[in-house]
A protein has these predicted regions:
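Membrane-interfacial hairpin junctions
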Residues: 35-49
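Extended, folded cores of ATP/NTP-driven motor/assembly subunits in large transport
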Residues: 2-7, 11-24, 46-495
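Hydrophobic, membrane-inserted alpha-helices
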Residues: 28-38, 54-58
Length: 495
């Protein structure tokens, strides 16, 4: 059963400035006003033209669609993708026939500098770290076995949520933690493991009736099911205080290993079951199947589980489209969350989106959390409160939306004053269908299924246009921190 406890009051950071159009556009408007006043002393016509052009440009840039993008954002997005496509950067080839000497199937794009490192935790157990060469970060993936809330009482379910909030708060106070991501991967079960397990339990001299019953069970229930896996990935970034450089793998593994016992305990308290750290083979196999879905049946059919090296876990070929991503035997589309639900939700809101969908051969939902440290939390809460109040004061008749923002900002400031932390969160959804004849129809059907499930969860999804390859990589449970791949912007520094 689902608890009746509701959750909400999330809000976007308020841009500030005049009418909350943002500080850069506000400064631009003041600049237009100053130039207009100076020109009016010399040439009134030139001043009028300057004011009209300047105010018109600012108005166009201030208008944003439901995806929070203006004309400039959409134009840059499209032109950047076209320029990269003309340069051939939307195509990738690897393996023996690729124009490289290694002959390996390495990962493409922003995953090209990702490697795996083995180390020991506080108890001497071996674990695997994902090293991000581009950003100097390290990620630690845990395989979880969530107990679920289907048979849990309301108080138990509420305790899970409270423990999850405690985990986020503890990570916010931990130096070096930059991101937490939870990935739920659902795929059709081939039935190979089911048949193998039943075959192992069948003896040669079994009674005829029992043998026939087992054979009938294997035929009826081997296919048609779905398998789900849940991976929690923590991303760390450590810098040497003396040299200013990122820590080497041994030093980073030593610091991360000390946190493992406490993390496993907190994950269990939050309903994640007994978490265990993934091995190199499991991570490589997981990535290989994501890029080549047809390989899943082959890997499960082989009795000895062939070893997959990390250097060969990537695709043989992939091609990035404007709204899709073709990789080996699959075609995928990835969405990002534009807005959270407008109203309060319960703990079962994402149930349909996280569960198997009939029109998707594979589906991966990744929820990403960025926890602000306590010192920045108090500053941002107060900043949002002041900007929300300024927005109401600038309106002659305050709208319901503006008043709601004020109420949310006030409650947020009160909670942060009591010790709560601000958490930025996002959501990525990747749907994969098998490549081949009729793939466009199957991809459209998967699109309708995903968007319908997101609609029932009251989440506004948007395809990651022009960045399908990067979004696909970010949805994998490798701890990729997209914030560190975004080029610095002067406008972001001014906002």
């Amino acid at each position: 059963m689902a608890s009746n406890t509701t959750y909400g009051d999330w809000m976007r950071p308020i841009a500030g400035g005049i009418r909350n159009i943002g500080r850069p556009l506000t400064l631009a408007g003041l600049g237009v006003l100053v130039v207009t006043l100076m020109l009016s002393m010399v040439n009134v016509v030139a001043a009028i033209v300057t004011a009209a052009v300047g105010i018109g440009a600012i108005t166009v840039l201030a208008i944003r669609d439901r995806e929070h993008r203006n004309v400039l954002d959409r134009t840059v997005e499209r032109r950047t993708w076209l320029a990269e496509s003309r340069k051939g950067r939307a195509l990738y080839r690897s393996g023996m026939l690729a124009p490289v000497e290694s002959g390996q199937c390495r990962l493409p794009g922003i995953l090209s500098k990702v490697s795996l490192v083995e180390a020991n935790d506080g108890f001497g157990e071996r674990f695997t770290l994902v090293r991000h060469g581009h950003t100097g970060e390290y990620s630690l993936p845990f395989a979880c076995q969530p107990q679920g809330a289907g048979l849990a009482d309301d108080d138990v379910e509420d305790a899970y949520v409270a423990s999850w909030a405690g985990l986020l708060e503890a990570l916010g106070s931990e130096a070096g933690v930059t991101q937490l991501a939870v990935t739920v991967d659902t795929s059709p079960d081939s039935g190979v493991r089911f048949r193998r397990n039943l075959t192992r339990r069948t003896v040669a001299d079994a009674p005829e009736l029992a043998a026939r019953a087992m054979a009938q069970i294997m035929d009826l229930y081997a296919s048609g099911g779905a398998s789900s896996s849940v991976v929690l990935t923590l991303t760390f970034r450590y810098v040497d205080a003396r040299t200013g450089r990122f820590l080497e793998p041994d030093d980073a593994a030593r610091r991360i290993g000390q946190l493992v016992p406490g993390l496993i305990r907190r994950i269990a308290d939050a309903g994640g079951g007994t978490a265990r750290m993934l091995t190199i083979d499991e991570i490589s196999r997981m990535v290989r199947v994501a890029y080549d879905p047809a390989a899943q049946d082959t890997l499960e059919r082989d009795g000895e589980r062939p070893w997959i090296a990390w250097e060969d876990a990537g695709p043989v070929a992939c091609e990035t489209g404007w709204d899709h991503y073709r990789h080996d035997s699959g075609v995928s589309r990835t969405w990002e969350m534009c807005d959270p639900p407008k109203s309060n939700v319960t703990s079962s809101t994402l149930t349909r989106l996280l569960g198997p969908l009939a029109d998707c051969d594979r589906k991966r939902v990744t929820v990403i959390f960025h926890i602000l440290p306590p010192d920045r939390t108090a500053f941002m809460a107060e900043q949002n409160r002041q900007r929300a109040a300024n927005q109401v004061s600038q309106e002659r008749r305050a709208s319901i939306g503006a008043m709601s923002q004020v109420n949310k900002a006030n409650r947020q400031a009160i909670e942060t004053n009591r010790g709560a932390v601000i958490v930025f969160f996002g959501l990525l959804v990747t749907a994969t269908v098998r490549a081949g004849e009729g793939e466009a129809i199957r991809l459209d059907a998967a699109t309708h299924a995903v968007e319908g499930a997101a609609g029932s969860a009251r989440i506004d999804l948007r395809p990651c246009y022009g960045a399908q390859d990067s979004a696909f990589a970010a949805s994998l449970p490798l701890g990729l921190n997209l914030r560190n791949y975004t080029p610095p912007s002067v406008f972001n520094q001014l906002s």
